[in-house]
Amino acid sequence: MDIKRSGDHVSRRGPSDYFTGAVQIDAPFNGSGALSGGTVTFDPGARTAWHTHPLGQTLLVVAGVGRVQREGGPVEQVRPGDIVWFEPGEKHWHGASATTAMQHLAINESLDGTAV
């Protein structure tokens, strides 16, 4: 068993190569094998760049109001308790609404050491 205590980790800013606006990444974890994830907090208007995941991505919205979009689809609003699944290779972005911050737990699997 491995317990990661709240406050025992170092927060980091989302790099500008992958995010627009202020984004904070907390509590990254690595599970068995290739599973990883973390809590990502987006300031109002902040979002990811368009990207894909080789084995897909699951988002669990925990706070605020967010927006998600897959390539060719409409922008969808998400709220706490909503779960979003992006298929492997599906081009998409996700982030906060224009006026409200959003926080989600992102869970990914890596393929050959790459999750994005």
Where are these regions (language model features)?
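Short, conserved beta-strand element in jelly-roll/cupin
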Residues: 39-43, 52-68, 107-110
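Short beta-strand His + acidic residue motifs that chelate non-heme Fe in jelly-roll/DSBH
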Residues: 48-50, 68-69, 86, 91-98
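Short acidic-glycine-tyrosine-enriched beta hairpin
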Residues: 72-88
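Conserved short histidine dyad/triad with adjacent acidic residue
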Residues: 22, 36-53, 88
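Ligand-binding pocket scaffold of soluble enzyme catalytic domains
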Residues: 32, 46, 68, 99-108
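A short hydrophobic beta-strand segment most commonly corresponding to one strand
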Residues: 58, 85, 99-116
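Beta-rich strand-turn-strand
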Residues: 74-77, 95, 99
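A short, N-terminal "cap"/entry segment at the start of jelly-roll beta-barrel domains
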Residues: 1-35, 115-116
